[in-house]
Amino acid sequence: MADQATLILIKPDGLKKSLTGNILTRLSETKLEIVASKITRVSNELARDHYKHLKDKPFYEDLIKYIRGELHDRRKVMALVYWGEDAIIKCRSLAGTTNPEEADPTSIRGSYGRITTSGLYENVVHVSANAEDAEREIKLWFEPEDIIVDLYPTKEAVIREKKTS
């Protein structure tokens, strides 16, 4: 399989519970390269763009509050781009299924996630579902210059590369 990128978010509950080190250690098992990372506040616009495919779901507004940190008094996330062979499959496998109670108990979500009394999944991490989602999400969360490899070369980058070849 070819190299690919995936977006990983360590969500506000993961930061509040000081799980960042544990999660990064688990993700290091993939032998993938981190090509971008930052800790950032999540604007309302970014949250809604990221989860726009879920806007018709009854839990949408709670999900927006969750990713923005409004439910945990931790208004930031750690965003990372992992790069390498089968990045999406490897990271999703380690993360586990979305529902923490159905996730393998040895997965990140199975180990650290929970479902609130209101039914909201607090699953500590987000991992892109597929290559199309990964590209869309990475472009939402990072500027091209923030990523140490040219994941999605712009027309200008392709022209520059041809001139230097």
Specify the residue positions occupied by each region the protein language model found.
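Non-catalytic terminal and connector segments of soluble metabolic enzymes
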Residues: M1-S165
